[in-house]
């Protein structure tokens, strides 16, 4: 463990996680938004549970739907630990119709959906490299303390997410 603090980019050869660890973890900044259900959300809304986050700019296209489906299946695969995990879509919805919003809510029940009207400070936490967070198509994992700690690329297999989460939920007393 000491080596990780001294050399944060180093990973042992036997590292078995499928996602990319975010080192150091990034705490989510304070935020205040309203989800599609009209409920106020802030940073405490994401505390106490592991949260799979997907950021989308504009209409939810085929890849967006596939990612949301994968996230839902990953959560369902957690069995008895399903209640320790939640899903969040942060959606820059410039011009997206109410019908599209309603369709997303219908197809992905229980999915927290938060529309953005501007580049919120929350989104900047997800900026990991030269790719803009709203167009990177990644799935991000936020821990129950409100820290961004891992991400998955668009072509990563959901089975890897399932295995990582099974391990995290098994060995973590959080969430």
Description of each model-found segment:
Residues 54, 87-89, 141:
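Structural beta-sheet core signal
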Residues 1-5:
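Hydrophobic membrane-insertion alpha-helices, especially the h-region
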Residues 10, 68-89:
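Conserved helix-turn-beta segment immediately C-terminal to the redox Cys motif
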Residues 56-58, 90-94:
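Structural motif
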Residues 135-175:
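Thiol-/selenol-based redox modules, centered on thioredoxin-like
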Residues 8-44:
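N-terminal "domain-start" segment that seeds a small globular fold
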Residues 86-88, 95, 99-137:
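Short, internal strand/loop/helix patches
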Residues 43-71:
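Short active-site neighborhood of thiol/selenol oxidoreductases, capturing the structured segment around
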């Amino acid at each position: 463990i000491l080596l990780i603090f001294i050399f944060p980019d180093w990973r042992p050869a036997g590292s078995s996680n499928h996602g990319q660890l975010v080192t150091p973890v990034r705490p989510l900044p304070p935020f205040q938004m309203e989800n599609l259900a009209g409920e106020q959300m802030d940073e405490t809304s994401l505390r106490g549970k592991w949260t799979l986050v997907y950021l989308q700019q504009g209409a939810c296209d085929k890849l967006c739907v596939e990612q949301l489906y994968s996230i839902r299946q990953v959560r369902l695969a957690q069995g008895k630990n399903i209640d320790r995990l939640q899903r969040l879509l942060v959606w820059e919805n410039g011009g997206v119709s109410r019908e599209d919003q309603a369709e997303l809510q219908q197809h992905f029940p229980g999915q927290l959906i938060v529309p953005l009207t501007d580049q919120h400070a929350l989104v900047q936490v997800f900026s990991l490299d030269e790719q803009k967070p709203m167009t990177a198509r990644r799935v991000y994992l936020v821990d129950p303390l409100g820290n961004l700690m891992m991400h998955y690329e668009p072509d990563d297999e959901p089975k890897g997410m399932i295995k990582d989460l099974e391990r995290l939920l098994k060995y973590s007393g959080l969430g």
